[in-house]
Amino acid sequence: MTCLFGMLLSTGALLKVLDPGPLTQDASSSLFAIGDQTIDRVFETNVPLRAEHWKSIYIHQSLTSGGDAMSLGRGGAGLADHFVIGNGSGCADGEIQIGRRWSQQLPSGLPDAARSDSISICLVGDFNHNHPTATQEARLAQLVTALQHQFRISSEHVLLVTRRNAGVLGAGTNFPVAELRAQLIP
């Protein structure tokens, strides 16, 4: 009995030491990565999908060499985007991370997003100096076409700005706009 009590006490103390503490606003439990076969998981949100609300998709770069949704979400308001697609530095190449704003069906927190009814996708990277990875490009096309299909968003409402202008972050001058547009649903 004493041995069992000692083991339970030790286990409890170890768990207390290893406890990371409560999740912050940016570290929502709804932040998870999805793989190729599970793209439909983006439609499994904590609240009902607001299908009538989402009218466009806004794609931009992080202007960082690496990172993930947690690092991009540091600051007062947390992650401003609905989705983050990794470049292999900070998270897996092509990994799609889903943020709290999407799982709660909230508007993007980006000041430069075109409209409040835009779904915001951030690709990790600085595409004014580098190019997205082939895996990022493939996963972006997969995500965008799934969103287009689900919410009936035409390709003309997939918004990309290739250069910074009037405070708009954009997708970067090296972003392959024509290649992405060729894969979109008209």
Predicted stretch roles:
Residues G75-A77, A114, R152:
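Glycine-centered secondary-structure boundary/capping sites
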Residues M1-H53, I96, D117, L123-P186:
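Basic/polar, cationic surfaces and motifs that engage anionic cell-wall
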Residues T38-Q104:
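Short, conserved "active-site rim" segments that organize catalytic pockets and cofactor/ligand binding
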